[in-house]
């Protein structure tokens, strides 16, 4: 890690910090996503019922009234307010996260992954505490935005993912990296399914604070694990200032430093492909709960929890599908198959007016998440071992930008098209997915130059 130290000569390494055990990073991702999925649909439903109460709208809708397709102007205003406040939270998180993710991710290349994991865990913990205050004390909704901003300042879930994926890249070989990344994403899915079922039962009586208390307990355990049990994967660590432009420069240099053209071209185009994938995934996720709450579906908390669990299931089925398909297909063609099923699922959502059709759409997404671990593994092979943190912090930035675009497009488009075609945002999502499909096909055709397949594992 030459050039990282503050003084010339051989860098001064930090002494190895004693930990209770040398735990892997997967439990952190599992616990973090468990807490987030537990809170996500609950926050949307809380906003819905909070605005319903403020506007005098009867939120307890019956099945027979849901079959009536006439538009209630008050219900439409509730949907619009819920969608817009979701947008405000995501925009606030992005604007702060754009600065903090790049700073903290590149910093972790020097000081190790643990400090970033601890900071991100504390940020998620703080956000949950503020959410509890809002629900318990009936505070202004703006405090939810404040919690989102404070969480982003400390790294947020995207920073935790950046450190986690970089940690996997630190210890995995080029051959096993794709499946290790998929395994990490599978932890996200299993945690999401479990949290969805538990969240549905906790919300039976619409006591919104209960899931937040459980999330607080989970995040407390996660923070302690990150601080005392995680086994550091960066072997040579050097004391480095946090607030310095060097960290941002190291991220920019990944894309602009003079290097063999093909390597940097692939870096940029794969980043674009994963940007579109995340935009579609997060955009659809943002409006699905709202789509299911309103007519003609009118799902209750139990059905929403089942739908949220089905939304997480592709993390697990994609891991199994990837493992099986790798025996007979190259990674790129596995990704193309996943994109086809993703497109089909979005098209079914667009025209779903009954519950069985919605679950058919969820079923078609069973291979939809093979794409992102494949792209992450390909990107990881394009940079040096000492640049893994910078790379995944750049991807965290891409994730934040995708979240902003997803919120801006889908949360604005959804209320705007309620009177025309309610499922139009899902049709747009299906169309956008052709972009990564085309990009990956082009890059695969041009991907046979051996010198860019793998850097040495040692710096």
UniProtKB/Swiss-Prot annotation:
Protein's UniProt name: Proton-coupled folate transporter
Binding site for H(+): 156, 185, 281
Record-annotated disulphide pairs: 66-298
Subunit comment: Monomer.
Keyword match Ribonucleoprotein: no
GO biological process assignments: folate import across plasma membrane; folic acid transport; heme transport; tetrahydrofolate biosynthetic process; transmembrane transport
Membrane topology: Multi-pass membrane protein
Assigned GO CC terms: apical plasma membrane; basolateral plasma membrane; cytoplasm; endosome; endosome membrane; plasma membrane
Top-rank lineage group of the source organism: Eukaryota
Coiled-coil regions listed: none
Residues in the Extracellular compartment per record: 45-82, 136-140, 204-208, 290-302, 352-355, 415-422
Modified residues (Phosphoserine): 458
Residues the record lists as N-acetylmethionine modifications: 1
Subcellular location: Cell membrane; Apical cell membrane; Basolateral cell membrane; Endosome membrane
Ranges facing Cytoplasmic side: 1-25, 109-112, 155-177, 228-266, 326-331, 377-388, 442-459
Designated gene of the protein: SLC46A1
Keyword Membrane: yes
């Amino acid at each position: 890690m030459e050039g990282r130290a503050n003084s010339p000569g051989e860098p001064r390494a930090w002494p190895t910090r004693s930990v209770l055990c040398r735990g892997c990073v997967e439990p952190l991702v599992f616990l973090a996503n468990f807490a987030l999925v537990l809170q996500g649909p609950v926050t949307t439903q809380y906003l819905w019922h909070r605005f319903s109460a403020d506007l005098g709208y009867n939120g307890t809708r019956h099945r027979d009234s849901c079959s009536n397709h006439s538009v209630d102007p008050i219900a439409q205003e509730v949907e619009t307010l819920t969608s817009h406040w979701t947008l405000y939270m995501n925009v606030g998180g992005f604007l702060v996260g754009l600065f903090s993710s790049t700073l903290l991710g590149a910093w972790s290349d020097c000081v190790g992954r643990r400090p970033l994991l601890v900071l991100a865990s504390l940020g998620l913990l703080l956000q949950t505490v503020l959410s509890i205050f809002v629900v318990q004390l009936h505070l202004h909704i703006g405090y939810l935005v404040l919690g989102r901003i404070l969480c982003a300042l400390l790294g947020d879930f995207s920073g935790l993912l950046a450190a986690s994926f970089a940690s996997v890249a630190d210890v995995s070989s080029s051959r096993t990296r794709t499946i290790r990344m998929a395994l990490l994403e599978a932890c996200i899915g299993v945690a999401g399914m479990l949290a969805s079922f538990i969240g549905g039962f906790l919300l039976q009586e619409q006591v919104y604070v209960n899931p937040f208390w459980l999330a607080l307990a989970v995040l407390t355990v996660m923070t302690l694990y990150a601080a005392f049990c995680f086994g550091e994967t960066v072997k040579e660590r050097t004391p480095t200032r946090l607030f310095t432009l060097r960290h941002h420069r190291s991220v920019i240099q990944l894309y602009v430093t003079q290097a063999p053209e093909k390597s940097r071209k692939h870096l940029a185009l794969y980043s674009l492909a994963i940007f579109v994938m995340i935009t579609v995934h997060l955009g659809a996720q943002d409006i699905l709960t709202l789509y299911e709450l309103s007519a003609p579906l009118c799902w209750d908390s139990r059905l929403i929890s089942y739908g949220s669990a089905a939304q997480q299931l592709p993390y697990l089925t994609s891991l199994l599908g990837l493992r099986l398909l790798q025996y007979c297909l190259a990674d790129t063609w596995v990704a193309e198959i996943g994109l086809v099923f993703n497109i089909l699922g979005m098209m079914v959502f667009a025209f779903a007016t009954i519950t069985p059709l919605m679950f058919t759409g969820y079923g078609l997404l069973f291979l939809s998440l093979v794409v992102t671990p494949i792209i992450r593994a390909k990107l990881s092979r394009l940079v040096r071992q000492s640049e893994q943190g910078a790379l995944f912090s750049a991807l965290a930035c891409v994730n934040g930008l995708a979240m902003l675009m997803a919120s801006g497009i889908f949360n604005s488009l959804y209320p705007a098209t309620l009177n025309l075609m309610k499922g139009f945002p899902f049709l747009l999502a299906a169309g956008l997915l052709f972009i990564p499909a085309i990009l990956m096909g082009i890059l695969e055709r041009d991907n046979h130059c051996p010198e860019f397949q793998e850097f040495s594992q040692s710096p």
